[in-house]
């Protein structure tokens, strides 16, 4: 099993990227959630526009699916400039980045997704571009090689990453603004689901939007994916209108429970509870018990369960919390 196979995966498919583009907010006034980020960016953008400057370089980090690309689009729209988009793995050679930089207009935004995956050679080109708006290019090879400097227009680099710790210090230090996106609160997700439903022309009650939001794991991308599947269910099994009851029926059918857990989440927790009496259990034993690789458990399954307080990592192994026992209606053992 890989993360992309799961309905509640925070990763995006190409089809979802296209579908989500139509319902993304375009301006800060439409941006829901992340109140601290929103208020700070409003000030930074207004200040840059009043001075007639490019916005400082911006690093956005946080778990996948929280709207890093959306925020980059909003920044470009608010600044009234073009947005050029690429990603770390695509920029294989220094020339790839140089070509993008030399085609920028003044104050344009260059958005690099997965910026932690830039190669060292490409990263070296970014340093003078970010600091001095200059491009240092080597022409020729061997003894005949020479360096030339190309002046660049003032621009804004927006880097997005799910792994801020993987960025090198020299790159991280060149960002004047750093924003962390947090998991969304249920009321904010409910608002997002309702807005998406209206854009899709759906008849959906507030309670229906709330039911989807509760199971979306704090992630707008998951909320919109669940909404599309609930829409399918409502159109086939009912008259297309989505109430809380219909949303719950659809999500139960899709094996997404009230906490947003899918079959694999529940399988892991039940293995710890049933097979290992709540733990502690070593990672290798747990992997064998559920038929998954240890890397899948560590990187895909565990993080959300730990973050929500259903699983603990201890020096002796993984343990189910009281909250996990209660989730399945099982009485936890008495603590010695």
Swiss-Prot record:
Listed GO CC annotations? cytoplasm; Holliday junction resolvase complex
Classify the source by domain of life: Bacteria
Which residues are listed for DNA binding in this entry?
A: 294, 313, 318
Annotated S-S bridges: none
Which reaction does this chain catalyze?
Answer: ATP + H2O = ADP + phosphate + H(+)
Q: Which UniProt keywords apply?
A: ATP-binding, Cytoplasm, DNA damage, DNA recombination, DNA repair, DNA-binding, Hydrolase, Nucleotide-binding
| Source organism (scientific name) | Salmonella typhimurium (strain LT2 / SGSC1412 / ATCC 700720)
Q: Which family does it belong to?
A: Belongs to the RuvB family.
Name of the protein in its database record: Holliday junction branch migration complex subunit RuvB
- What coarse category fits the chief subcellular location reported for this protein? cytoplasm
Q: Which region ranges are annotated with the description Large ATPase domain (RuvB-L)?
A: 4-184, 24-184
Subcellular location, record wording: Cytoplasm
Q: Which GO terms describe its biological process?
A: DNA recombination; DNA repair
């Amino acid at each position: 099993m890989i993360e992309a196979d799961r309905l509640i995966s925070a990763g995006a498919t190409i089809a979802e990227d296209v579908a989500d583009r139509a319902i993304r907010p375009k301006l800060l006034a439409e941006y829901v959630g992340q109140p601290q980020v929103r208020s700070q960016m409003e000030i930074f953008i207004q200040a840059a526009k009043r001075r007639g400057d490019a916005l400082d370089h911006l690093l956005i980090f946080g778990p996948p699916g929280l709207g890093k690309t959306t925020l980059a689009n909003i920044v470009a729209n608010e600044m009234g400039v073009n947005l050029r988009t690429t990603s770390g793995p695509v920029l294989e050679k220094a020339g790839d980045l140089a070509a993008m930089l030399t085609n920028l207009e003044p104050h344009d935004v260059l958005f690099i997704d997965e910026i932690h995956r830039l190669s060292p050679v490409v990263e070296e080109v970014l340093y003078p571009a970010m600091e001095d708006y200059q491009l240092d290019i080597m022409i020729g090879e061997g003894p005949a090689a020479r360096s030339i400097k190309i002046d660049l227009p003032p621009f804004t680099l927006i880097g997005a990453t799910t792994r801020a710790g993987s960025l090198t210090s020299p790159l991280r230090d060149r960002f004047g603004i750093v924003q962390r996106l947090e998991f969304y609160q249920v009321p904010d997700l409910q608002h997002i689901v309702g807005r998406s439903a209206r854009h899709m022309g759906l008849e959906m009650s507030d309670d229906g939007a709330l039911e989807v939001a509760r199971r979306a794991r704090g992630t707008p991308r998951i909320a919109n994916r669940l909404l599309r599947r609930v829409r399918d269910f409502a159109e086939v099994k009912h008259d297309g209108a989505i109430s809380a009851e219909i949303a719950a029926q659809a999500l139960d059918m899709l094996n997404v429970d009230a906490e947003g857990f899918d079959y694999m989440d529940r399988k892991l927790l039940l293995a710890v509870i049933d097979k290992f009496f709540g733990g502690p259990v070593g990672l290798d034993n747990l992997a064998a018990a559920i038929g998954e690789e240890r890397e899948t458990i560590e990187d895909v399954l565990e993080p959300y369960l730990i973050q929500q307080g259903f699983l603990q990592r201890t020096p002796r192994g993984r343990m189910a919390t009281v909250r996990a026992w209660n989730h399945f209606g099982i009485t936890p053992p008495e603590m010695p």
